[in-house]
């Protein structure tokens, strides 16, 4: 999403699934959850935006760009299809 560069920074709230200081897994899971949510409910579904804000706050831009490219090519490792 192009809004990333214009949106204000914010701190992501606590998530009990990721109590460790290292938030790499939280970043990955939020990216996957966002795309799963969008595939099931559509981009305008407000709860999906929580995952979008989380992964944009936690994940390095290089990772996001790489994952976006992988999704476009159909080689993304995560399961983002609706179950």
Curated annotation (Swiss-Prot):
Phosphoserine is found on 82
Q: Where is the CHCH domain?
A: 24-67
Q: Where is this motif: Cx9C motif?
A: 27-37
The residue numbers the entry assigns to motif Cx10C motif are 48-59
Disulfide pattern:
27-59, 37-48
| A GO CC term attached to the entry | mitochondrion
Q: Its topology with respect to the membrane?
A: Peripheral membrane protein
One molecular function GO term is: oxidoreductase activity
Pathway(s) annotated for this protein in UniProt: Energy metabolism; oxidative phosphorylation
Any Pfam family? COX6B
Q: Name the InterPro entries on file.
A: COX6B-like, CX6/COA6-like_sf, Cyt_c_oxidase_su6B
Q: Name one GO biological process term.
A: mitochondrial electron transport, cytochrome c to oxygen
* Coarse class of the protein's main subcellular location: mitochondrion
Alphabetized, the UniProt keywords read: Disulfide bond, Membrane, Mitochondrion, Mitochondrion inner membrane, Oxidoreductase, Phosphoprotein
User: What compartments host this protein?
Assistant: Mitochondrion inner membrane
Miscellaneous notes: Present with 1390 molecules/cell in log phase SD medium.
Q: Which family does it belong to?
A: Belongs to the cytochrome c oxidase subunit 6B family.
Instruction: Relate the assembly described in the record.
Output: Component of the cytochrome c oxidase (complex IV, CIV), a multisubunit enzyme composed of 12 subunits. The complex is composed of a catalytic core of 3 subunits COX1, COX2 and COX3, encoded in the mitochondrial DNA, and 9 supernumerary subunits COX4, COX5A (or COX5B), COX6, COX7, COX8, COX9, COX12, COX13 and COX26, which are encoded in the nuclear genome.
Q: Entry's PANTHER family? A: CYTOCHROME C OXIDASE SUBUNIT 6B (PTHR11387)
Q: What does this protein do?
A: Component of the cytochrome c oxidase, the last enzyme in the mitochondrial electron transport chain which drives oxidative phosphorylation. The respiratory chain contains 3 multisubunit complexes succinate dehydrogenase (complex II, CII), ubiquinol-cytochrome c oxidoreductase (cytochrome b-c1 complex, complex III, CIII) and cytochrome c oxidase (complex IV, CIV), that cooperate to transfer electrons derived from NADH and succinate to molecular oxygen, creating an electrochemical gradient over the inner membrane that drives transmembrane transport and the ATP synthase.
Q: What is known of its domains?
A: The Cx9C/Cx10C motifs are involved in the recognition by the mitochondrial MIA40-ERV1 disulfide relay system and the subsequent transfer of disulfide bonds by dithiol/disulfide exchange reactions to the newly imported protein.
Q: What is this protein called?
A: Cytochrome c oxidase subunit 12, mitochondrial
């Amino acid at each position: 999403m192009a809004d990333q560069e214009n949106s204000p920074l914010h701190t992501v709230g606590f998530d009990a699934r990721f109590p460790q200081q290292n938030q790499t897994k939280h970043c990955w899971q939020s990216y996957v959850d966002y795309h799963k949510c969008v595939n099931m409910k559509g981009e305008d579904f407000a709860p999906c935006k929580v995952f979008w804000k989380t992964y944009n706050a936690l994940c390095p831009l290089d990772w996001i760009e790489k994952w976006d490219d992988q999704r476009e090519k159909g080689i993304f490792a995560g399961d983002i299809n609706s179950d």
